């Protein structure tokens, strides 16, 4: 086993989780971190004991000993330029979703990674949720037969929605439904999406942030299978969890339902009322264990670099997801279905 040197750029919520996972991994020889907020940099450095803790990520890219970079920066427009700089420095890349803001950016990154023989994967962490993985297996092993339809409903609270929607002008399709588009396309592969229709609502977030409250998306696959995804970020602040998800996958021989609303564990206190403490999409540390998919996803990336394996999520798959949610945004804007051509360029139906 080759031990690797890893850099984490951006150590906020998700980046902090990844830095801690790297620090604890037997695959990692050296950890290096970069964070522009001094207090957060100091906090994460105290937990992870990195070799380097810098406010300037370029310091890490100049270090030839670093093999791989995990990019967990916000706002999202930073993804493309930092990923490009990292690839030009010869680093393998883990990049949080979205892969980019424009398709040409995604295509350039994919081509650059291929030309330099670099691993390049995107953070679609829900593939590492055991409940979601069971849905995938139930299709692959024939338990529910051939897929007929799917429904995914994902909604987060307004407090979290304002934090996300307020930092970048991307819709719930791009920021929330993207996880579920990736998940369903992964389950239904090798089927391809051919048509997208979407409707959005603007009653709460639009005035302040100019983003929709929620979006409902219908995607038709090339074999006629249809799936629907609803995603929003306006659950009331008093709702007792961060993220609430429900999945229905119906096949010719059966169906599988997933309740990922996190109601299986709840805490009631005099001060805060009812709370679902294990309810964030990335997950959270609970004493000596980790509840949620992000730690497993991070470990998977480290394994891929150390053991020279292909990542579960490919950049090409992330580009396909991007084409679908961009088509959803276009459909919501025009009120018309959008056809996806063979090369996945959105056009009005």
Enumerate the predicted regions with their spans.
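Conserved SAM-binding strand-loop segment of SAM-dependent methyltransferases
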Residues: 50-57
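Rossmann-like NAD(P)H-binding beta-loop-alpha module
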Residues: 130-158
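C-terminal helix-rich "cap/oligomerization" subdomain common to oxidoreductases
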Residues: 3, 8, 28, 68-70, ...
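Glycine-rich, N-terminal phosphate-binding loop of Rossmann-like dinucleotide-binding domains
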Residues: 72-73, 154
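Rossmann-like dinucleotide-binding domain that binds NAD(P)(H)
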Residues: 160-244, 316
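NAD(P)-dinucleotide binding in Rossmann-like oxidoreductases
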Residues: 207, 222-296
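Beta-strand-loop-alpha-helix segment that lines the small-molecule cofactor/substrate pocket
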Residues: 68, 75, 80-127, 142
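N-terminal Rossmann-like dinucleotide-binding module
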Residues: 1-48, 72, 184
